[in-house]
Amino acid sequence: MTQRFSFTRLGQDGAARLGRINTPRGEIRTPAFMPVGTAATVKAMRPESVRETGADILLGNTYHLMLRPTAERIARLGGLHRFMNWDRPILTDSGGFQVMSLTGLRKLTEQGVTFKSHIDGSKHMLSPERSMEIQKLLRSDIVMCFDECPALPAPRERITESMELSMRWAARSREAFGDWPGHALFGIQQGGLEEDLRGKSAEALRAIEFDGYAVGGLAVGEGQEAMFGVLDYAPGMLPEDKPRYLMGVGKPGDLVGAVKRGIDMFDCVLPSRSGRTGQVFTRRGVVNIKNARHADDPRPLDEDCTCPACRSYSRAYLHHVFRAGEILSSMLLTWHNLHYYQELMQGMRDAIGAGDFAGFEARFLAQQAEGDIAPV
């Protein structure tokens, strides 16, 4: 008999939750951060290296994979896990966010979204039913329902229409997903910055019943203060016994603030994208390795970090390979950033378990405020 998807709460400190998601492909410790493998790869990283950073799960992108190499081809080759050599859980987004971002290249109707590929201009259709079909072909462990995500700020009327459409699409996604033992379907709460609309969305999703719930429609231009304002109430509208996922977030401070408010799961391209552009996350804030101040610095990025970049290379060397445009720079800095994010999540898990999340947050903010070490 196939093991079913489940979520166990192991502890709580204020609204911050410690938990474990069980899947047939392994356990996911929560709060969890998912590296983004857009096109079946976390850029500049081998799958084995991603696992070594401490990641229990990664994210794949339905929109990009449906266009290239296509979900049908991946299915013929044994599914996304075998295709990319990742034997741990995978969450796939629905493709909705990317499609909605194609301004001028898409047409939105009740049925779904017709759009032109950014690769070759070919015409495609994404609907709740097609999104579920693609994610099943990929054999995703956690499937996201198809939704619309308008950019903020937006008029209340636009947010209302979008939320109501997303709830109708959520019901169609649930029906198309059916019963797929060992796999999970997450609903996505919408409603922008409007508390009453968030409440109506949560009520509709609870009636449909999902295996987990995402807080969607944030990190789309509203800023951290407004995002935290929504997170002060939105997670509490969702079932306590199911995981809560904040999509597309974020910076280290965003993660700490969101965990404080009851979020269990995150994804973001920031640590990998920043690594490729010389932006490095440390306990003392962001380091710009391209800056000339690092050219003669024999010290590691972070003396307490155990990633390969910090164990074996100096700031001077990392500065050199970045300025020289060497591929090794992207590999090492991405590894460091992902390692830092996973260490941050482990620190939060430990703090929740010890009943010291407030202390953890205070220490985190104090260290970040100190800034980088003085130049040599």
From Swiss-Prot:
Catalytic-site annotation from UniProt: 93, 267
Molecular function GO labels: metal ion binding; tRNA-guanosine(34) queuine transglycosylase activity
A GO CC term attached to the entry: cytosol
SUPFAM superfamilies hit by this protein: tRNA-guanine transglycosylase
Pfam families membership: TGT (PF01702)
Cited NCBIfam families: Q_tRNA_tgt (TIGR00430), tgt_general (TIGR00449)
Function recorded in the entry: Catalyzes the base-exchange of a guanine (G) residue with the queuine precursor 7-aminomethyl-7-deazaguanine (PreQ1) at position 34 (anticodon wobble position) in tRNAs with GU(N) anticodons (tRNA-Asp, -Asn, -His and -Tyr). Catalysis occurs through a double-displacement mechanism. The nucleophile active site attacks the C1' of nucleotide 34 to detach the guanine base from the RNA, forming a covalent enzyme-RNA intermediate. The proton acceptor active site deprotonates the incoming PreQ1, allowing a nucleophilic attack on the C1' of the ribose to form the product.
Name the record gives this protein: Queuine tRNA-ribosyltransferase
Lineage summary: Bacteria, Pseudomonadati, Pseudomonadota, Alphaproteobacteria, Rhodobacterales
